[in-house]
Amino acid sequence: MFEKNDLINKFLKNALKYNQSHNLFNRNNKEELQRDISESISINPFIKNKLKIIDLGSGGGFPGIITAITNPECKIYLLEKNTKKSYFLKKTIIELGLANAFVVNKRLEQENSLGIFDLITARAFSSTKNILDLTINNSNKETQYLLLKGTKKTITEELNEIDTNNYIYEIINTEEKPKERNIVAIKKTNE
């Protein structure tokens, strides 16, 4: 785990440095980024070995880069339509030597060759219903979704928009402070 911690620390330093000149994300200090890293790590107990994962709207690398660092046996596709953010992600992958991470600089609806994923992650990307609709061609009954979301109130409102005959879900509190953060774990119930 020591090597993983070194990579996370290197990522943190690079992200802070790159953000100063390129304004990648709305984080100005190490403490805020460390909370983002902790939140990203909170999905690890739900990740199994050798999964094919896509992180929607990877932005500054949360949770995608952190997932790639902490789960080297998984293949992680980082989907990011913004060219500036994609460049940062590609540069980070090279600097950290992450052979298991790949950047897709497109919108999901523009990329049909990615296939089916075992796990779909997203953080601050879109509504739950929109994520499920966008990934219909990239998921099957075995696909799990781990969506990093805010308050249970907001999540409940979003989940009221999905067809509960087709999906089962669980809301898991990450206990991240100072803001309430939760993981929404979702699976299809049928094809």
Language-model-detected regions and their locations in the chain:
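Class I SAM-dependent transferase core
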Residues: 1-49, 54, 84-101
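Conserved SAM-binding loop of SAM-dependent methyltransferases across substrates and taxa
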Residues: 60-73
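Conserved SAM-binding motif I beta-strand of class I
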Residues: 75-80
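Short alpha-helix immediately C-terminal to the canonical SAM-binding loop
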Residues: 85-87, 128, 155-156
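Conserved SAM/SAH-binding loop
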Residues: 104-110, 125-126
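A short acidic, Gly/Pro-enriched loop at the edge of an enzyme's catalytic core
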Residues: 111-119
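Conserved beta-strand signature within the Rossmann-like core of class I S-adenosyl-L-methionine
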Residues: 142-153
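Active-site capping/gating segments
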Residues: 152-191
